[in-house]
Amino acid sequence: KIDEHHFLVLYLKIAAMFFGSKNYQNTVKYGQKIINSKGNVQEDLLFHTRILMLMAKFESGFDDDYDDFVKATMKFAKKMKNPGDLHFSIVNFFKKINDRNPKDQAIAFKEFEKELEISSQNKYDKRTLMYIDIHGWVTSKVRNVDVIEIIKEKVKLK
């Protein structure tokens, strides 16, 4: 029998699959299932679900509740037992990119990519970056290619 935690991990993987195929509505739908779960959900799973949902909301352009969701995610991060600086950097990044013009967004993505590159060398931060490939997504925005292309590159390197 599969316990609830493993179902929620499956939902996150399904949400990530939908994100990769640009089906952002279903990304958010499956993410919401995790957030609305009544059980005892691990906070790292909840945090990374929220980040994937922010990525989907940003990409889709259906961002009516984007700012509120960023605020709720920051509030959640502050309540986490052991949040790292990277957790707050990620949320702050989403906070600042939404209201910028495309040129300023491109600059913000480049700056954040550099920050993520440094963070990926840190043992603790590396673990955080393994849940959701935000680094790959940011890199795809910098290079102006689909995130799937970045994922394919990473798979070839392994």
State where each predicted segment sits:
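"A position-specific structural signal for the A-helix of alpha-solenoid helical repeats
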Residues: 6, 12-16, 20, 48-52, ...
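Short acidic (Asp/Glu) and glycine-rich catalytic loops that position anionic groups and cofactors
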Residues: 31-32, 50, 70, 89-92
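Long, ordered, amphipathic alpha-helical scaffolds
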Residues: 77-158
